[in-house]
UniProtKB/Swiss-Prot annotation:
<dbReference type="InterPro" id="IPR023799">
    <property type="entry name" value="RbfA_dom_sf"/>
</dbReference>
<dbReference type="InterPro" id="IPR015946">
    <property type="entry name" value="KH_dom-like_a/b"/>
</dbReference>
<dbReference type="GO" id="GO:0043024">
    <property type="term" value="F:ribosomal small subunit binding"/>
</dbReference>
<dbReference type="InterPro" id="IPR020053">
    <property type="entry name" value="Ribosome-bd_factorA_CS"/>
</dbReference>
<keyword id="KW-0690">Ribosome biogenesis</keyword>
<comment type="function">
    <text>One of several proteins that assist in the late maturation steps of the functional core of the 30S ribosomal subunit. Associates with free 30S ribosomal subunits (but not with 30S subunits that are part of 70S ribosomes or polysomes). Required for efficient processing of 16S rRNA. May interact with the 5'-terminal helix region of 16S rRNA.</text>
</comment>
<dbReference type="Pfam" id="PF02033">
    <property type="entry name" value="RBFA"/>
</dbReference>
<keyword id="KW-0963">Cytoplasm</keyword>
<dbReference type="GO" id="GO:0030490">
    <property type="term" value="P:maturation of SSU-rRNA"/>
</dbReference>
<protein>
    <recommendedName>
        <fullName>Ribosome-binding factor A</fullName>
    </recommendedName>
</protein>
<dbReference type="InterPro" id="IPR000238">
    <property type="entry name" value="RbfA"/>
</dbReference>
<dbReference type="GO" id="GO:0005829">
    <property type="term" value="C:cytosol"/>
</dbReference>
<comment type="similarity">
    <text>Belongs to the RbfA family.</text>
</comment>
<comment type="subunit">
    <text>Monomer. Binds 30S ribosomal subunits, but not 50S ribosomal subunits or 70S ribosomes.</text>
</comment>
Length: 112
């Protein structure tokens, strides 16, 4: 059975994605996070947690993953200051392998 998300949850997920992208560009000072791109955010229905999907352009995924996990509290506190929510969702960072798969398929198709 498909789980339907409400318009509010989708809207908040998009707001979180935009704010995290902005935070990564402006406030993080770690150069290893400069190649991180937020691809999608899926918030739970009760907005207690959010899965943040990301890709990496420069650094290795194994280097960036623990840094993002460690900085999730920092990102959550910054989001609580900018978003007008009663409770800010807990953030879980997940590597988005779908975008890499799509790029690989495009590369293979261009060779044909």
């Amino acid at each position: 059975m498909l789980e339907q998300t409400s318009y509010r949850v989708e809207r908040i997920s998009e707001l979180i994605r935009r704010e995290l992208t902005l935070l990564l560009k402006t406030t993080t000072k770690d150069p290893r996070l400069s190649g991180v791109m937020i691809t999608d955010v899926l918030a739970s229905r009760d907005l207690s947690s959010a899965k943040v999907f990301y890709t990496v352009t420069k650094e290795d995924r194994t280097v960036v993953e623990p840094i993002l996990s460690k900085a999730s509290g920092f990102f959550r506190s910054r989001l609580s200051k900018t978003l007008d929510l009663r409770h800010t969702p807990a953030l879980g960072f997940i590597f988005d392998s779908a975008s890499n798969t799509g790029a690989r398929i495009e590369q293979l198709l261009s060779k044909l």
